[in-house]
């Protein structure tokens, strides 16, 4: 029974270890539940270094349908620049010429009629380019996994210093790119990727900080915005055969995993950090919300379909994701989940379930239950404490696995003790039967007792003279 018990326990142990290492979707979802719970419970702090210029419903209603003419963006840039922003980053790709450009419309009319030959109009593309040159602007790039037939030779503005293996071997790769027009990118101070990686349940929990797009290394929009805002030119990337080990600017260390992915620590983002784009156009806003802030220009309008769900349970505009990443980078506060935390998590997992295989079988049942509860509590407390220091260790799956092992171990202990109890009961039954048989044998060894009737009976008669003496006697029966 003992050998069979350990065979079953060993099989379950191996099964749990294998699925932990393989990490199939169901295990990922279990870990996501734990991760999201922490994000909701320990959602401390506030993003204060970023302001979002919001292309909202109000702006669409007053300015008109989207996309807008480029001179509107030019006006937004010029009005923002009056109040000394650290950097302005667009969450909008300008991949085509301005279709509402009066210059282009005039050229079309001039082809059809000579009446418009002497008319002069503004070239909104050029107006926008001029504003870009006067500003500290970061434009976006998007990774495209399929063939892209639009040739664009724009290259990263970031200067990369690589130590160790080539980072392109480890970071997320896209075959091609979608980005703004080359003349716009040339006028910008930086270019960063806005590609997001939703998890299997569609929630944004982590994003790459570096991308391999078109066989070139591009930073994320958030990282590029921080670089331009702080006046840095270089980014150090250190890697080895296991992947990315270090991403560092002059002022910030960015703890990513081996694939250059960071886990976002979401904080409170006050609605006051949003300014309607139309208010910027009309120059009707509080300048303190712009001064020395990193400005993101994006959209919260439902019609533009840039709404995502994040791990603290909220649904937010996609541009707000970049705001949280920027805050994490500036404060070195993103959640660390890398090779070291994974190894630590696996060691805790193994120790926990091994203990719960052997120890409960060696102590009394009531103490084994106390040990089990204590082990689960200790694992979760360790996970929570680690999270306070921005390290993520999943406690939910180890707790579930430990419960399975403990219940299985307890079940086999019950079977074993029940088997022993049944065996003892059989022995007691045999002993009882043997005692009964021995008693019967012993009875047969003693002589049989004569049945005595009316034992307490006497008859007193007068004394008789026998040879000169007098005697009394008692008659018990007729013969005695």
What are these regions (language model features)?
Residues 2-252, 290-371:
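Non-transmembrane functional regions of envelope-associated proteins
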Residues 16-20, 375-385:
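Aromatic-anchored segments of alpha-helical transmembrane domains
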Residues 368-378, 398-401:
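Central hydrophobic cores of alpha-helical transmembrane segments
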Residues 401-426:
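Juxtamembrane or sensor-core-proximal signal-transducing alpha helices
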Residues 423-480:
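… and, occasionally, acidic/histidine-rich disordered N-termini of signaling adaptors
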């Amino acid at each position: 029974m003992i050998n069979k018990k350990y065979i079953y326990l060993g099989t379950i142990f191996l099964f749990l270890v294998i699925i932990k290492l393989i990490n199939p979707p169901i295990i990922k979802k279990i870990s996501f539940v734990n991760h999201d719970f922490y994000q909701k419970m320990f959602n401390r702090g506030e993003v204060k270094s970023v302001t979002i210029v919001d292309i909202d419903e109000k702006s669409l209603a007053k300015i008109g349908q989207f996309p807008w003419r480029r001179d509107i963006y030019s006006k937004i840039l010029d009005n923002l620049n009056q109040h000394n922003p650290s950097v302005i980053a667009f969450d909008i790709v300008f991949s085509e010429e301005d279709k509402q450009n009066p210059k282009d419309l005039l050229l079309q009319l001039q082809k059809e009629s000579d009446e418009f030959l002497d008319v002069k109009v503004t070239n909104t593309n050029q107006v926008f380019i001029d504003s870009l040159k006067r500003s500290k602007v970061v434009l976006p790039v998007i990774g495209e996994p399929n063939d892209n037939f639009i040739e664009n030779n724009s290259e990263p503005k970031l200067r990369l210093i690589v130590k160790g293996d080539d980072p392109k071997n480890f970071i997320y790769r896209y075959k091609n790119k979608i980005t703004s027009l080359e003349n716009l990118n040339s006028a910008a101070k930086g270019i960063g990727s806005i590609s997001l990686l939703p998890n299997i349940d569609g929630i944004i929990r982590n994003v790459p900080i570096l991308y391999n797009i078109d066989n070139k290394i591009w930073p994320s929009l958030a990282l590029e915005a921080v670089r331009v805002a702080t006046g840095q030119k270089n980014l150090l990337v250190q890697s080895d055969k296991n992947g990315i080990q270090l991403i560092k600017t002059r002022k910030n260390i960015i703890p990513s995993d081996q694939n250059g992915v960071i886990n976002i620590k979401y904080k409170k983002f006050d609605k006051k950090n949003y300014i309607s784009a139309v208010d910027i156009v009309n120059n009707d806003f509080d300048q303190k919300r712009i001064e020395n802030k990193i400005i993101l220009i994006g959209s919260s309008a439902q019609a533009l379909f840039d709404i995502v769900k994040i791990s603290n349970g909220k649904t937010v505009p996609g541009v707000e994701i970049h705001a949280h990443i920027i805050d994490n980078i500036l404060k070195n506060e993103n959640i660390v989940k890398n090779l070291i935390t994974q190894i630590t998590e696996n060691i805790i997992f193994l120790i926990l379930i091994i203990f719960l295989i052997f120890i409960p079988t060696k102590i009394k049942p009531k103490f084994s239950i106390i040990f089990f509860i204590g082990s689960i509590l200790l694992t979760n407390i360790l996970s929570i404490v680690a999270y306070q220091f921005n390290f993520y260790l999943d406690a939910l799956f180890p707790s579930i696995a430990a419960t399975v092992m403990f219940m299985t171990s307890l079940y086999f202990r019950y079977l074993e003790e029940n088997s022993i109890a049944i065996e003892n009961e059989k022995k007691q039954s045999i002993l009882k039967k043997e005692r009964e048989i021995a008693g019967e044998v012993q009875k047969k060894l003693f002589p049989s007792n004569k049945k005595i009737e009316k034992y307490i009976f006497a008859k007193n008669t007068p004394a008789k003279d026998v040879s000169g003496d007098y005697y009394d006697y008692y008659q018990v029966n007729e013969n005695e």
